[in-house]
Regions:
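Short helix-initiation/N-cap motifs at beta->coil->alpha
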Residues: 1-5, 92-98, 175-190
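A structural signal for short loop-to-beta-strand junctions that line the ligand-binding cleft
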Residues: 5-6, 11-14, 41-79, 229-231, ...
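Hinge/lid segment of periplasmic solute-binding proteins
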Residues: 18-71, 125-128, 216-220, 287-289
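Short, solvent-exposed loop/beta-turn-alpha elements that line the ligand-binding surface or hinge
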Residues: 32-47, 89-92, 108, 113-122, ...
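C-terminal capping/gating helix-and-loop segments adjacent to ligand/active sites or protein-protein/ligand interfaces
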Residues: 279-280, 293-346
Length: 350
């Protein structure tokens, strides 16, 4: 149903979708300022805030959430049993993540690894790694997105964790260093990875495969370096109204309707997709798989974030970005976090 909703939106030429580039498009004048309309919503506080904040420039609001895709931690319960781990307990800290991944690695089974990382995909890497930094209460960018703040203890702890796995036999799946994101989720889906961060939009396929006799999957929020603290990357698509639209009122009617609890239930919850309305997440999934409720909880708890920078794509997502090079250096090479952080800032502040 996500694609039906997306297609319906795209048939309206006045509506535009964006992801991590919301601030860029807003600052370039692509969207209509709908601050008054958004602030006038009775349920604004019930909406997932990441996509609203990402599309806010100089106090003006341009976007609302449409498709919400969040990152969670998944693990293979079958491999956990073989490794002598509790199959019902995923990692509650980065140190536990490493410990559990190394236990699976020690099975020394053909093609099986503790974890997996998309080493050449800046987008997958921010989706996987930023939540652990946020969980610790640290930041990845300054407020206006012009400076990287990755030179902190939490980021270092996360990078050290993956470096430890990279230096462990079977710690990271073969191809992690070269993974462009094209087959990022496949190794876990194929039953070859113990535990890794994962997009919630891909978990449905895991659950369906499980019903057909596949391995059982565990799901938990992504932890930080401090036990019990979690966060998520609020990804997906935000939606705004084109600056050139001659039908702003009609477009707003559609957007305001889509934000309502009733519409969120019909369009998203009833079709097994993730709503962006907190009240819908709390009330419309009571009969859903408990793991779906766990996924929803990472949005409900309000700890998730969407990074905000006009130059986010160039600094993080683009092939060969300074962020991608930071990961390559920190996990598989010689790390200089201060210098690599500055290289990201140099792009952000152009």
């Amino acid at each position: 149903m996500i694609w039906k909703a997306r297609s319906a939106a795209l048939r309206r030429p006045t509506l535009c979708l964006t992801s991590s580039q919301a601030m860029y498009w807003a600052s370039e004048g692509i969207f209509t300022d709908i601050t008054k309309q958004i602030d006038g919503l009775d349920n604004k506080d019930d909406l997932q805030q990441g996509h609203i904040e990402a599309g806010t420039v100089d106090g003006a609001e341009y976007t609302l959430p449409f498709i919400t895709d969040v990152s969670v931690m998944v693990w293979n319960k079958e491999l956990y049993k073989k490794a002598g781990l509790d199959p019902d307990k995923g990692p509650s800290s980065i140190s536990e993540f490493v410990e559990q991944a190394k236990k699976v690695a020690a099975l020394n089974e053909d093609g099986v690894a503790g974890s997996y990382l998309a080493g050449q995909s800046g987008g997958a890497l921010v989706f996987d790694l930023f939540p652990s930094v946020w969980a610790d209460g640290e930041t990845v960018l300054n407020d206006d997105g012009t400076e990287a703040t990755l030179n902190n203890d939490s980021m270092k702890g996360v990078l050290d964790a993956y470096k430890e796995l990279a230096n462990t036999t079977n710690g990271l799946g073969a191809g992690s260093k070269e993974e462009t994101g094209a087959t990022w989720t496949a190794p876990f889906a194929n039953g070859k990875i113990g535990v890794m961060p994962y997009p919630n939009t891909s978990t449905t396929a895991l659950f369906d495969a499980e019903k057909d006799g596949g391995f059982e999957v565990g799901v938990t929020p992504i932890p930080g370096t401090k036990e019990g603290k979690t966060s998520t990357f609020l990804g997906g698509d935000a939606m705004g109204i084109s600056k050139d639209s001659k039908h702003v009122a009609q477009a707003w009617n559609f957007l305001s309707w889509l934000m309502s609890n009733d519409a969120q239930k019909k369009v998203f919850a009833d079709n097994g997709d993730t709503a962006s309305n907190i009240q819908t997440l709390k009330t419309a999934y009571k009969d859903a798989d408990p793991r779906v409720q766990t996924i929803n909880s990472v949005i409900i708890d309000g700890n998730g974030k969407t990074p905000k920078s006009a130059a986010f794509n160039e600094a993080f997502n683009a092939a060969g970005s300074p962020w991608q090079l930071l990961i390559q250096n920190a996990v598989w090479g010689k790390s200089d976090l201060k210098a690599d952080n500055q290289a990201i800032t140099d792009v952000l502040d152009q």
